Amino acid sequence: HATTTEYRDLVRIDLGDYLASGGSSLGTLPEQIRTACENVGVFFVINHGISEDLIRRIFAESKRFHDLPFEDKTALSVNQNQRGYIVPGATKVKHSTYNKNTKFDTNATMVFASEYGEDNPHRRAGKRFYSENQWPDNLPGFKKTVTEYMETLTGLGKMMLPLWAAALELPSEYFGPYFENNYTYFRMSHYPPVPELGDNEFGLGPHADTGFMTFLPQ
């Protein structure tokens, strides 16, 4: 049967005044975010306070990692806590109501997440996902940049919580307590060239993220 594709402009959400006010001046941002999410589902954030230098450095570190020999990367293979390297063709996402993904994804990914100290009760109990990251030992400065990037994006996400609350007509402080011990999940992905994708084959199949917010750098 024939299908049509509807194209919509992505909304640009300007956080400049909001961040400059320390989060006190919400203005019309909640309404803008709600409209964007209800009508498109994604939006551009501008004047977000993340430096161009940091974005440049994280892309450079991603290239450095994915340029490593295959055996160096697979030595850090993803573990039961979902931290580590995932080879191309190893995953098939299923969280989508729009497409039944039947082929394995072609992307390669190195996964990092919030680290928890040995005194964390969940980690002491052996609860899954509460662990330390796996780090390559032959990339000087890599861990520092990845950690800085994750901490910076986490900070931005927390600053945006009052906007999400207001967009849902909730008190501005509503989400704060739920993110005091947040879990940040960072996928450092690489999409190697594929001469021709097969039918229903994707670099990363259609899916819905399970986290509260997802940031994609451009």
Model-predicted segments: where are they?
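Peripheral, non-catalytic segments flanking oxidoreductase cores
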Residues: 1-218
